[in-house]
A protein has these predicted regions:
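The beta1-alpha1 cofactor-binding region of Rossmann-like NAD(H)/NADP(H)-dependent oxidoreductases
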Residues: 64, 84-96, 127
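C-terminal helical subdomain
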Residues: 207-208, 224-288
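Catalytic loop of short-chain dehydrogenase/reductase
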Residues: 153, 159-200, 212-213
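Substrate-binding pocket helix/loop in short-chain dehydrogenase/reductase
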Residues: 121-122, 126-131
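Active-site loop of short-chain dehydrogenase/reductase
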Residues: 23, 78-79, 106-107, 152-166, ...
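Conserved glycine-rich cofactor-binding loop
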Residues: 24, 31-32
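Conserved glycine-rich Rossmann-like NAD(P)H-binding loop of the short-chain dehydrogenase/reductase
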Residues: 45-68
């Protein structure tokens, strides 16, 4: 069984609510990959971007820091606020939210992008790694959402977007990496619960997941995966832009796939997103 994929898709492209100039987007894990791609997309529209992530010094295998991302955001036309934030620590979260309000005065959208992953079986997943995945994926998503909510509810078109998959209960998605699947589905359950909880408050809570694997520095470290058969992270950024442009009062509780969103917006050719257009894209996790 797969939790409902989507509803309320606009068939006329992005909605009239797509003016993000001076709007504030709070993004966790925005130093690289999908998070940074989303940040740059909104920066091009003149948005204020909060980079809430841990990396302040370059990692030899995973390049990019919050300060590097901030420079790129400013160059793209946005305003950046890099804040070192471990989303497992509620004090750091609260401090990041307060810094955001002090600088920009509002939070209009939250993108819960930060995630920890270990594709390992039960006997190969020590509790330290288990706790990391649950601390970041479930607790972190919940805690950041909770901290941002009082300010989101003051926005005229507030959105929470979790980079999370549909809940697919096919046992094959649990068989090889039970801990990660449960932790990732925790982010999805936040969408189900919060969208229902705040459905009368005009707050949209949705999930976005890539239909195919996305080319990131982390993906290139996975043995046996052909990164050329992946898509650029810009496809997720374009889909996120479309979703956050929709009326928050009528678009909530959805589990969107990036390709589905863009098809609804009129996109028919996805070859420009491919790392190698001659390759067949590899489906992402949790999709049958």
């Amino acid at each position: 069984m797969i939790e409902k994929i989507s509803k309320n898709l606009s068939h006329t492209g992005v909605d009239i609510l797509s003016n993000f100039k001076n709007k504030t987007i709070f993004i966790t894990g925005a130093t690289r990959g999908i998070g940074k791609a989303i940040a740059l997309k909104f920066a091009e529209e003149g948005a204020n971007i909060v980079i809430a992530a841990k990396t302040v010094k370059p990692h030899p295998k995973l390049p990019g820091t919050i300060f590097d991302a901030a420079e790129e955001i400013e160059s793209a036309g946005g305003k950046a606020l890099p804040i070192r934030t471990d989303i497992r620590d509620e004090n750091q979260i609260n401090d990041a939210v307060q810094q955001t309000i002090d600088k920009f005065g509002s939070i209009d959208a939250l993108v819960n992008n930060a995630s920890a992953i270990s594709l390992t079986g039960t006997l190969e997943t020590p509790m330290k790694k288990f706790d990391l995945m649950f601390g970041v994926n479930v607790r972190g998503t919940y805690a950041v959402s909770q901290a941002c909510l009082p300010y989101l509810l003051k926005s005229n078109n507030p959105h929470i977007l979790n980079i999370a998959s549909p809940i697919n209960l096919n046992p094959k998605w649990f068989q090889e990496y039970t801990a990660y699947t449960i932790a990732k589905y925790g982010m999805s359950m936040c969408v189900i619960g919060m969208s229902e909880e705040f459905k009368n408050d005009g707050l949209a809570v949705n999930a976005l997941w890539p239909k195919t694997i996305i080319d990131t520095a982390a993906l290139r470290l996975v043995p046996g995966v052909d990164s050329e058969a992946s898509r650029d992270a810009s496809i997720m950024a374009d889909a996120a832009y479309s979703i956050l442009s929709k009326d928050s009062k009528t678009c909530s509780g959805n589990f969107f796939l990036d390709e589905e969103v863009l098809v609804s917006d009129g996109v028919t050719d996805f070859s420009n997103y491919m790392v190698n257009p001659n390759k067949t894209p590899i489906p992402d996790l949790f999709l049958d």
